[in-house]
Swiss-Prot record:
E.C. number: 3.4.23.-, 2.7.7.49
Annotated GO MF terms: endonuclease activity; nucleic acid binding; peptidase activity; RNA-directed DNA polymerase activity
Protein name: Retrovirus-related Pol polyprotein from transposon opus
SUPFAM superfamilies listed in its UniProt record: DNA/RNA polymerases, Ribonuclease H-like
Any GO CC annotation of this UniProt entry: nucleus
Lineage: Eukaryota, Metazoa, Ecdysozoa, Arthropoda, Hexapoda
PANTHER family listed in its UniProt record: PROTEIN CBG26694, PROTEIN NYNRIN-LIKE
């Protein structure tokens, strides 16, 4: 408190004899004196910012402990009680260091240090940008300030980021200001994200419901108050024309800067957040329900900030207000509204001329969409412009892509601006009262309004709406209405989860019964389970009463002039919207148009203005065609004609002149809403003779040899006959030219057949030639035990193959069956004679069907995975050594089929009992393994055969078309014709002696 005033020539010893007035403050302990702007003018003194001193006369300098520019007048609103200013001054006087100039030698006391974790150890260097010559002085000035404040220091770091100069908001006198910024774009791309959560703005605002008084505190140079971790300081390096520097404090522009600062401020105010204040990065709001409590709450927050040596910008702070600006909103005791300054900036924006400007406008308005009733509807013409060709445009290029608003989009642009300017105040939620959630859905959007009863008046808390995607547009009406409820509950979860009663109002009465136990719709059942998380009471509200939510979901479609044009009076439109149920405005009620000719419908109504009398004919059996005269008379004649000719069970085709479409639509909507009707304007020739049909199909097919679907569409332009698709498919399926030269678009997928299961190890052996690191190996795997072995092979010559095969069969004790692919070396007489001498059956996989020999192919895949990992872990080992190690690792690992190690099964290492026990144990083990193999095979085949068919059977002499897989050119035949000699269920043997898998045959 000021006790008295002193006036005198206090600076006379320094050469200035001006009378100076000082006010005595006994509680001022941080300084000997504070000089204001008027005193500086009287002294004609100069503040030397660089040297932090006051120059009274040339040669006389006074060191300054602090310097600041503070506008004291707006700290309090005028309507506060008497004495409030004195209480505030006293409170601020308790914490003088909080309001000292930025970074005046103090260190923030917090456990949080700013670090930059990157996914690479390589220094990130970006070339400097050339900035304007006339800005060099400004850059040097700002560099000097940062050096003086201890924010940066000279650097010799290998890292580098460029700087740029951007304009700031001008001073009140119009003087331009600039800010030096560092572009950390390249550093940010390699920075590991800090996942610390930033508070949800809507949840924060919703929690201020019972408060009456507010104080907002703005932290001075927020990020610069946090020290950088010493090891990460070099990463912040940047260069200018006069040197290179690095940040000692957290700079602006780093990817993780907001999360780091939020962690720091949460650490400092942890005990008070949610009780007396909320924090969003460097913005703090202190709240209370009454005047006296507010001083206590404010003192607690200031004490915590003072203890941590954080500094507050007094100019941007507001104390003890009933209405404050916070996070772009105006927070009052009555509720929340949009910030008029932000709204004014939006209202003054010109129409966008580029994609970037359009997205910027939509982003700004979307921030306030909770205030805009029916935002999805109003903004839809603009959001449509960001899709299609403009959807994948990069942000850096969006400013170069021009865009033009049509009349509808321009109207949407102006409507959004005008609605924002007149938006109402949204109420705070009261969590002790029931919530009202009113929802509605249309064919293109869903919407809802959350409200509560306030003294007999239903006050809105939030408006929400969104457009439906393509999948959701195909939902049934009841599913769309349920989706509106589910989406609204999820979107408003911060308000509704754990709340008391939630009354959900819908204008779709069947929905109130769909939540019962007799509902068999799986999708609705799943959604019902999600609704049960909330304490909901579903209430039917007729469309007349459900105006707001109904409007949120109404985005009127373009009806192509099929209905009467609405008057350009928005009041009339809203009046009709408020007094009619949403279903009556639904475009899905209009009779759809189709491209097919009227001939395809079994009941055809052809209206003709030139016809004088009615005629009924039957172009085909089961088809009826009504030729009806149409005159410009009353609606009764047209209604009577439709009543007598329409059939309620089947789809009716109608051909009517476009001039009478509107009349026809209105009659159908009023009298025939449940009938299936399609409108078309096409009539083609009927073809009934079998020979004529075959000739037409043959002529069209030979023209381009297209498929049945294309031929049908082509013929429908001129002709129609019943069962067109099946007739065309049957006739074209026998075309030899198509079978030989066309691709097989739907290849055969015969069911996978079970393969023989061995009873013991070494009964069935799979072999293949395997190349690795310029060496050949004979790969062998026992089908029973899954034990594998690689034998070195000198070449694929039959003599070398026979030598290696002898070694392998000796190791595996001559199996009963040997499975291999079509390796030529195995077909030579010497190898075949050797196998016959050992009584070994050789089974060949069909040509180019290596998957039939899948046991060894699957082993190769697993072996290569192990080999590559070993090669990385043991770089000094030779490839041959790695091969042996990899095979050993495979054999000593548990196999997923047998649940045992292949080596244990193959060598029976697990048996360590007496002879009799060994035999019984061995027998039981083999039976268990066989059962596992059989089970895995059956289960695998069942899963893979879901989309496959039973193999087609062929008799001796049947023609089959075999794929020419060896052909490398595209102009030759894709298939060749062969005759079947023997059908082996999954393969066929042709008269040429070759075996083909049935998946290689044309359907």
């Amino acid at each position: 408190m000021i006790t008295h005033r002193l006036v005198g020539k206090f600076f006379k010893p320094l050469g200035n004899d001006s009378d100076i007035t000082f006010f005595v403050l006994p509680n001022l302990h941080s300084f000997d004196g504070i000089i204001g702007d008027d005193t500086l003018k009287d002294l004609k003194a100069i503040v030397d910012r660089k040297n932090n001193c006051l120059i009274i006369t040339p040669g006389i300098k006074i060191p300054l402990l602090a310097r600041a520019s503070i506008n004291v007048n707006p700290l309090l609103a005028a309507e506060h009680p008497d004495g409030t200013q004195e209480i505030l001054n006293s409170l601020l006087g308790e914490f003088p260091r909080i309001f000292e100039p930025p970074l005046s030698g103090m260190s923030v006391e917090t456990a949080v240090k700013a670090e930059i974790r990157t996914n690479t150890q390589d220094p990130i260097y970006a070339k400097s940008y050339p900035y304007p010559v006339n800005m060099r002085g400004e850059v040097e000035r700002q560099i000097d300030e940062l050096l003086q404040d201890g924010i940066i220091r000279p650097s010799n770091s290998p890292y580098n980021s460029p700087i740029w100069i951007v304009p700031k908001k001008p001073k009140p006198n119009g003087e331009k200001q600039y800010r030096m910024v560092v572009d950390f774009k390249r550093l940010n791309t390699v920075t590991i994200p800090d996942t610390y959560p930033i508070p949800d703005i809507n949840a924060t605002l919703a929690s201020l419901g019972n408060a009456k008084y507010f104080t907002t505190l703005d932290l001075t140079s927020g990020f610069h108050q946090i020290h950088m971790k010493e090891s990460d300081i070099p990463k912040t390096a940047f260069s200018t024309l006069n040197g290179k520097y690095e940040f000692l404090r957290l700079p602006f522009g780093l990817k993780n800067a907001p999360a780091i600062f939020q962690r720091m401020i949460d650490d400092i105010l942890r005990e008070h957040i949610g009780k007396v204040c909320y924090v969003y990065i460097d913005d703090i709001i202190v709240f209370s329900e009454d005047y006296d409590t507010h001083w206590k709450n404010l003192r607690l927050v200031l004490a915590s900030l003072s203890k941590a040596n954080l500094q507050v910008n007094l100019e941007k702070s507001h104390f003890l207000d009933t209405q404050v600006e916070f996070l772009g909103y105006i927070v009052t005791a009555d509720g929340i509204k949009a910030d008029p300054k932000k709204v004014r900036a939006i209202s003054e924006m010109p129409p966008p001329t580029s994609v970037k400007e359009l997205k910027r406008f939509l982003g700004m308005t979307s921030y306030y969409r909770k205030f805009i009733q029916d935002y999805a509807k109003v903004a839809k013409p603009l959001t449509n412009l960001t899709r299609g060709l403009y959807a994948n445009i990069k942000s850096s290029q969006s400013s170069k892509v021009p865009i033009t608003l049509d009349e509808t989009a321009l109207q949407s642009f102006n409507d959004l601006k005008s609605i924002l300017c007149s938006s109402e105040i949204l109420a705070f939620p009261c969590f002790t009262k029931p919530f009202h959630l009113t929802t509605d859905a249309s064919n293109w959007a869903i919407g809802a309004v959350l409200s509560q009863d306030d003294q007999g008046r239903d006050r809105p808390i939030a408006y929400i709406s969104r457009s439906l995607n393509k999948t959701e547009e195909n939902y049934a009406t009841i599913e769309k209405e349920m989706l509106a409820i589910i989406w609204s509950l999820d979107n408003l979860r911060a308000y509704l989860y754990g709340a008391g009663t939630i009354k959900v109002y819908t204008d779709h009465q069947p929905l109130t019964f769909a939540l019962g136990n007799r509902n068999f719709n799986a999708k609705l059942k799943r959604w019902k389970a999600r609704i049960e998380e909330y304490n909901c009471e579903l209430i039917y509200k007729p469309g007349k009463s459900n105006v707001v939510a109904d409007a949120l979901s109404r985005i009127p479609p373009q009806l192509n002039q099929l209905s009467t044009d609405l008057d350009a009076n928005p009041e009339d439109d809203m009046q009709s919207l408020a007094t009619a149920h949403s279903a009556l405005h639904d475009s899905s009620r209009l009779i759809p148009h189709v491209e097919s000719p009227i001939n395809v419908f079994k009941n055809q109504l052809i209206f003709d203005t030139t016809r004088s009398k009615y005629l009924c004919e039957h172009p085909f059996p089961g088809y009826t065609r009504h030729l009806i005269p149409l005159k410009d008379g009353s609606l009764a004649d047209l209604t009577n004609s439709l009543q007598s000719c329409l059939r309620p069970v089947i789809i009716n085709g109608v051909k009517i002149p476009e001039a009478h479409l509107q009349r026809f639509q209105s009659i159908c909507l009023a009298n025939f809403l449940l009938y299936k009707i399609r409108i078309t304007q096409r009539l083609v020739a009927d073809v009934s003779g079998a020979e004529e049909i075959c000739e037409i199909i043959e002529k069209e097919h030979r023209r381009a040899h297209r498929g049945p679907t294309e031929i049908r569409l082509q013929l429908l332009e001129k002709y129609y006959f019943p069962r067109m698709s099946s007739t065309i498919r049957l006739q074209t399926s026998s075309c030899q030219c198509c079978k030989l030269y066309k691709y097989e678009r739907h290849p055969n997928k015969p069911n996978l057949q079970p393969t023989p299961i061995p009873n013991y190890p070494c009964e069935i052996l799979h072999i293949d030639i395997f190349a690795l690191e310029k060496r050949l190996y004979l790969s062998c795997i026992d089908k029973f035990s899954k034990f594998a072995k690689l034998f070195h092979l000198q070449s694929k010559a039959s003599v070398h193959l026979r030598e290696t095969l002898v070694e392998a069969l000796h190791y595996f004790t001559a199996p009963k069956v040997l499975v291999s692919d079509n390796e030529r070396g195995l077909l030579c007489p010497t190898v075949l004679n050797y196998l016959r001498s050992l009584d070994i059956d050789l089974y060949y996989a069909p040509t180019q069907k290596s998957e039939v020999n899948g046991q060894v192919e699957r082993f190769h895949s697993t072996f290569l995975e192990i080999y590559r990992c070993l090669k990385d872990e043991l770089p000094t080992f030779k490839p041959v050594e790695l091969v042996h190690i990899a095979v050993d690792r495979y054999n000593t690992s548990v196999h997923s089929v047998t649940n045992r190690k292949p080596a244990d099964v193959f060598f029976d290492r697990s048996s360590r009992v007496n002879y009799q026990g060994l035999t019984d144990f061995r027998r039981q083990t083999l039976e268990d393994i066989k059962g596992l193999i059989e089970y895995k095979q059956i289960r695998g085949n069942m899963a893979r055969n879901k989309n496959r068919d039973e193999p087609k059977s062929y008799g001796p002499g049947d023609e089959v078309f075999v794929a020419n897989k060896q052909i490398k050119t595209k102009e030759k035949a894709r298939f060749r014709c062969e005759k079947v000699q023997e059908d082996n269920k999954i393969t066929v043997k042709t008269r040429s002696g070759k075996i083909f898998h049935k998946s290689d045959l044309r359907n």
